[in-house]
A protein has these predicted regions:
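Cytoplasmic helix-loop-helix junction between adjacent transmembrane helices
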Residues: 1-21
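Helix-loop-helix hairpin linking two adjacent transmembrane segments in secondary transporters
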Residues: 23-70
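A late C-terminal transmembrane helix in Major Facilitator Superfamily
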Residues: 27, 219-254
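Interfacial helix-cap and linker-helix signal at transmembrane-aqueous boundaries
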Residues: 32-41, 46, 127-128, 159-160, ...
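Flexible cytoplasmic inter-helical loops of multi-pass small-molecule transporters
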Residues: 67-90, 286
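Extracytoplasmic gate region of multi-pass secondary transporters
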Residues: 94-156, 244-247
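Cytoplasmic membrane-interface "Motif A"-like loop-to-helix N-cap segments
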Residues: 162-173
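C-terminal ends and interior cores of transmembrane alpha-helices
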Residues: 175-188
Length: 286
């Protein structure tokens, strides 16, 4: 992801969105392939076959990758920060951790990704228990979520190049809350509100995934973005742990998912507030 963005500094949002969308589609493409392999052999053999295939593909593709030259600038493009006399400083991970804005961005990532990680983990179960879908029909919910997740990464990345990263994340936070409220209002047979809800959550989650690589590079420089974004990814890991855990515990306690949607709404609103906290630090820096 970071290598691609270095070659396209004028389109960091779009390129970050496309690359994250492509690796996100792996969760859609791989399962049916693995299912066929397991059916033909067994689980242990499937792990070996997939592992060897990945090793060959990844190592093979690595021969075609090139390191981006230092201070690379596409023809005809002038870096806006340099033109404004406000050049972004390339910070390493230690310097990044010393800045207050890093922790704001980390918490924003967790809050923004919370609803997506929560619903992705239980999308099929929600469709079955809340809407009354059959297991076969409920499986389409996962596919719909994956499609809007991938679309959100590309569309939000492109949008962030036009209106700015933080403005795009503000919109994504609101969209996620709207999606959660639609799920909260969903009952038996509520196909329309259910699919609209997971579509909104998919777009919101995809937006955070697509925008954050460029967002991190914009804030701390592109030179060390591979490491810096890897550390920033801890925010997603937090959402990946607390989101599904909260949903399972609430369902086990209450026998319904509605309380989990309200908890996720609180995180989404907190994320929206954090976008203004980020703006405060950004203005202070300027």
């Amino acid at each position: 992801v970071s290598t691609c963005m270095k070659f396209f500094p004028d389109k960091r949002g779009l390129i970050g969105g496309i690359t994250t969308a492509i690796y996100g589609l792996g969760s859609v493409i791989l399962p049916p392939i693995v299912t066929e392999i397991v059916a033909a052999t067994d689980a242990a053999a499937a792990f070996k076959i997939v592992g060897i295939a990945f090793l060959v593909i990844i190592c093979g593709c690595s021969f075609f990758m090139e390191q981006c030259p230092a201070d690379f600038v596409p023809d005809g493009w002038t870096p806006p920060t340099a033109a404004a006399g406000n050049q972004v400083e390339n910070k390493n991970w230690k310097e990044m951790l010393k800045t207050p804005v890093f922790y704001v961005m980390l918490l924003l990532f967790t809050c923004g990704a919370f609803s997506g990680m929560m619903v992705i983990s239980q999308a099929s179960a929600v469709a079955t228990n809340m809407v009354g879908m059959t297991a076969i029909v409920a499986s389409t919910a996962v596919s719909v979520l994956a499609v809007f997740n991938a679309a959100g990464r590309i569309l939000a990345g492109l949008l962030s190049d036009w209106i700015g990263r933080i403005n795009t994340l503000s919109v994504a936070s609101v969209l996620g809350v709207v999606g959660l409220l639609l799920l909260y209002m969903t009952g038996q047979g509520g196909y329309v509100t259910f699919y609209l809800g997971i579509a909104g959550i998919g777009l919101s989650f995809g937006s955070f995934m697509g925008v954050y690589p460029g967002f991190t590079a914009d804030q701390f420089g592109a030179k060390n973005n591979s490491v810096n974004y890897g550390i920033m990814f801890i925010g997603l890991a937090g959402a990946g742990y607390f989101g599904p855990s909260a949903m399972r515990k609430i369902y086990m306690t209450e026998g319904t998912y509605h309380g989990a949607f309200l908890v996720a709404c609180a995180f989404g609103l907190a994320g929206f507030v954090l976008t203004f906290v980020y703006r405060f630090f950004a203005k202070k820096k300027a």
